[in-house]
Each structure stands twice: as C-alpha cells, then as structure tokens.
C-alpha cells in the first residue's frame, strides 16, 4: 500500500506521543484520521479538537464507517498495544494493511534528509533543540518529535521548502531500524528495555546496527566515550562531541550564575562565544552541543545558533518549571532511567546549590524497576529528601515481589517516604520545601498542578 495514496488512517494506541505526531501529520495531509486509546488525556483531547475521531473503549462497533474499507484505510499501531487487542485482531482478520508506527515513520521520511537523534536519554531534548535551531533559521525543517515543544505547542513541524526532517529515533522494539538517516546522533546507550532486548549486549548491538543505516553521504555524531562501535558505510563521516573533554565539538568556559548558564561552543574551524541556554540546566549543555553541531553542519549560521539556543523553551515535561519563586521552585521532568534521573538531580542541585532538593519519583514499568532497583536507589540517594510513589505499570502486568519497596529499602538518605499516588497530596501538604523535582514517565504529571497549588498556599501563609 502506498501510504501517500490512502484516504483514511486508523491508529490503535492513538495517545502515545510518537503516534500523535503521525496523527497530526496525516491530518495536515487531509486524510480522515481516527483511533483508539485506553484512556483520555490532554493530548488525545487536543487531537480530537484538531479533527481526529478518537474513542476509549476496545470495541469494534465504535470504529467509524470511514475506517471500514481495507482498500483505502491504513491501520497504524504501537508495540505497547497487546497482540490480543480486539480492534487490532479485527483489522488483521479483515485484510487491512496494518503497520507498526516505526515503519510508517520510516516510509514517510525515507525520501527526505533525516536528522535522526537516538539514545537512551537526551534524545527528546536534543532533537527538539535541533528542530528549533533549524526552524528559526533560513534552513528550516520538518520534525517528528517525542515531546511537545513549547515554542510551537506541537510535536510535529512541517515545511514547504526544506527537505530536512528531524526525527527522534526510538530504540524501543528496535523501532529506529526502520529509519534511513542522512545524519545520526547517539546521545547515550545505557542499557534499557531489557524486557525487549534481553541483555545489555543486545541493546548496545541495536545502536551499532542503527549506525549502519546512515546514508553514504551522511555522518554520525556520537558522544565521546559511549560504548558503541559504529558500523559505518564507506563515505560516512564520524564526529564526536562532549562537555567535559576535548572532542570534535565541545563546550568550554561554562558559567553558571544566578540561575543562568552560558558557554562557548567549539568545533572544527568554529567558535561561538557566550551561548546562553534558554532552559538553564547543566545537562542541556551536552544536549546543546550536539544540536548545535548538527545544525552548523547543515548550514545554520552562528548568529542563528545563538538566537535559537537562547529562545529554546524546551519540550513539555523536560525540566519544565511550573513554579519559580524566591521561596520555592517546582520542576517536572520525564526522567525514568537511573542515569537520566542522576543527571536531573545533579543538574538541579548545582543550579540551586545550598537549597534543599525534594524529589517525588514515580517508577515506570515493573521490569525496569526489577532490573535497575539498585541503580535507581543510588540516584535517588543524591536527593536531600525523597517521596517515592508506586510503580506506574504502563503496558505491563505486575511481577511478584517487584514494587517500589525494592528501591526504597536501598535508598540511603534518612529523609524518605513511601506512599501511594492517592496519598501524595496529603504528604506534600504536611511538609516544607525549597526545590521540588517531580520525576517519572507515567502519570505523575497529572499531580503537578495540585502540588503547585499546595506550594502556592504555603508561600502565601504569613
């Protein structure tokens, strides 16, 4: 089936962030778009307002007539949806073309110059930065992102003039193997998704295969020190980047003062002084070096790079400041792997040195909790105070003996609390705070506004 010739597209698992970018793409192309998701969310409601016909019950009777013809309807699904799903089974049994999200994204973008950002962590912010740097310059771009970029309030960007497409290259279920990168970035390769890959070696190998997909006229930009051996085709250039050591692209003269961060960007035959971070957290220096490097390699001028970095507002839920006063700060972040959790905490502690940092963490997935309990505990022990919630299961069934308790018992700081999500607001109301970091990839974000209200009330008390 030629994706460009279908008239209707139906999404099974419409509320996922990657799926929603495709929904917006097909809506922009004038297709009829519908789908199913398990629960309503702000994102699915936004998609409905934009024209998508979405329902929340796995029921074939709710599939609209516009999506009942196998001849002109493409069905897209996410691997998070179980194979036993009733609607998915119906479409397969009735001869519909059924494709994984990753394959559809690969088909859409294969004719453009794909700038693909991969990594266990850092890929959403880095790809969003890169998209913004290109978009606000004459170079321009299309983009499929894994977060809602606040500068544009969308995870999709389209251009009538540019053939660059920035793509967040997701390693889950080996999705990024469907892509054909012109340029690729690897930000990190810390083992994750071991329920899919089985071993850390298999996880690392998937990144090596990803590098073999880069077009011969392209390049790879990889963070210095990552344990990945590229398998590049002949003609593919390789660059490294870093923050703390010399590489092809790196930062130096880093200054952190009064909640602001500036640095000098250094690359082959280029130096850009006094780059200011629009989202001033230390980890964004690293993300920024990678994004600036790819943008510069594709013709973005130094003055546009500086302007873009200063005006970058960040994706939702990536160091998202919800409250920033002299008395208390509230930050929401998506970190859900021990390494990125550690980065988040250290960035906040450096930015707000001398102030008490309280972390509210919701673990994501039973398998990830089981596989990395000790590493999670080590990262969380960097906090001054911890409130630990129950595990958010997402696509998984409970595993006997696996709960937040196995993390909690290994955390070494004395000020720690284990509570259910439903109890959180009462726990927060009983405490006093200076900097609060709410972290996790589940539904902890729905508690950010209620927590903010409690903190604001505490500020107003005489």
From Swiss-Prot:
Entry keyword set: ATP-binding, Cell cycle, Cell division, Cell shape, Cell wall biogenesis/degradation, Cytoplasm, Ligase, Nucleotide-binding, Peptidoglycan synthesis
Q: Which cysteines are joined by disulfide bonds?
A: none
Reactions catalysed, semicolon-separated, are: UDP-N-acetyl-alpha-D-muramate + L-alanine + ATP = UDP-N-acetyl-alpha-D-muramoyl-L-alanine + ADP + phosphate + H(+)
Say yes or no: keyword Nuclease present. Answer: no
Q: Which family does it belong to?
A: Belongs to the MurCDEF family.
Q: Do you know which PANTHER family this protein is assigned to?
A: UDP-N-ACETYLMURAMATE--L-ALANINE LIGASE, UDP-N-ACETYLMURAMATE--L-ALANINE LIGASE-RELATED
The lineage is: Bacteria, Pseudomonadati, Bacteroidota, Bacteroidia, Bacteroidales
Q: Which domain of life is it from?
A: Bacteria
Family matches, as InterPro entries: Mur-like_cat_sf (IPR036565), Mur_ligase_C (IPR004101), Mur_ligase_C_dom_sf (IPR036615), Mur_ligase_cen (IPR013221), Mur_ligase_N (IPR000713), MurCDEF_pg_biosynth (IPR050061), UDP-N-AcMur_Ala_ligase_MurC (IPR005758)
According to the UniProt record, one GO cellular component term is: cytoplasm
Q: What is its EC number?
A: 6.3.2.8
Q: What does this protein do?
A: Cell wall formation.
Q: Tell me the GO molecular function terms.
A: ATP binding; UDP-N-acetylmuramate-L-alanine ligase activity
Q: Where does ATP bind?
A: 119-125
**UniProt-annotated location(s):** Cytoplasm
Its pathway is: Cell wall biogenesis; peptidoglycan biosynthesis
- What is the name listed in the Swiss-Prot or TrEMBL entry for this protein? UDP-N-acetylmuramate--L-alanine ligase
Q: What class of enzyme is it?
A: ligase
Give the GO terms filed under biological process for this record: cell division; cell wall organization; peptidoglycan biosynthetic process; regulation of cell shape
A Pfam family the protein falls into:
Mur_ligase
Query: Which source organism does the UniProt entry give?
Result: Parabacteroides distasonis (strain ATCC 8503 / DSM 20701 / CIP 104284 / JCM 5825 / NCTC 11152)
């Amino acid at each position: 089936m030629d994706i460009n010739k279908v008239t209707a597209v139906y999404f099974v698992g419409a509320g996922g962030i990657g799926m929603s970018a495709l929904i917006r793409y097909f809506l922009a192309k004038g297709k009829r778009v519908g789908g199913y998701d398990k629960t309503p969310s702000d994102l699915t409601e936004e998609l409905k307002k934009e024209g998508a016909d979405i329902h929340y019950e796995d029921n074939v009777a709710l599939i609209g007539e516009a999506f009942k013809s196998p001849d002109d309807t493409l069905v897209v699904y996410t691997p998070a949806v179980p194979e036993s799903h009733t609607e998915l089974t119906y479409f397969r049994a009735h001869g519909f073309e059924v494709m994984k999200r990753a394959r559809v994204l690969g088909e859409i973008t294969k004719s453009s110059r794909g700038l693909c950002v991969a990594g266990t962590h850092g890929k959403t912010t880095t790809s969003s930065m890169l998209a913004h740097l290109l978009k606000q310059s004459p170079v321009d771009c299309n983009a499929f992102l894994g977060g809602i970029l606040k500068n544009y309030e969308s995870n999709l960007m389209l251009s009538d003039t540019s053939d660059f497409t920035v793509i967040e290259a997701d390693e889950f279920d080996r999705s990024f193997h469907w892509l054909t990168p012109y340029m690729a970035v690897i930000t990190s390769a810390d083992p994750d998704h071991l329920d899919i890959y089985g071993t850390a070696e298999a996880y690392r190998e998937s990144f090596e295969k990803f590098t073999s997909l880069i077009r011969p006229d392209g390049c790879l930009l990889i963070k210095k020190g990552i344990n990945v051996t590229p398998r590049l085709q002949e003609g593919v250039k390789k660059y490294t980047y870093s923050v703390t050591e010399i590489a092809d692209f790196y930062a130096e003269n880093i200054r952190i003062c009064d909640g602001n961060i500036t640095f000098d960007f250094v690359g082959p035959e280029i130096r850009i002084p006094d780059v200011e971070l629009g989202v001033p957290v230390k980890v964004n220096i690293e993300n920024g070096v990678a994004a600036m490097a790819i943008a510069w390699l594709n013709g973005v001028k130094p003055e546009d790079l500086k302007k873009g970095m200063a005006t970058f507002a960040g994706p939702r839920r990536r160091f998202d400041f919800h409250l920033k006063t002299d008395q208390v700060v509230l930050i929401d972040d998506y970190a859900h792997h021990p390494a990125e959790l550690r980065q988040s905490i250290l960035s906040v502690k450096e930015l707000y040195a001398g102030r008490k940092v309280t972390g509210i963490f919701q673990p994501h997935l039973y398998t990830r909790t089981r596989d990395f309990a000790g590493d999670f505990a080590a990262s969380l022990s960097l906090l001054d105070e911890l409130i630990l919630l129950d595990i958010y299961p997402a696509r998984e069934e409970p595993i006997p003996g696996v709960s937040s308790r196995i993390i909690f018992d290994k955390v070494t700081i004395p000020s720690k609390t284990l509570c259910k999500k439903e109890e959180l607001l009462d726990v927060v109301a009983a405490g006093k705070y200076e900097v609060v970091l709410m972290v996790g990839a589940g539904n902890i974000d729905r508690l950010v506004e209620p927590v903010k209200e409690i903190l604001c009330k505490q500020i107003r008390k005489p």
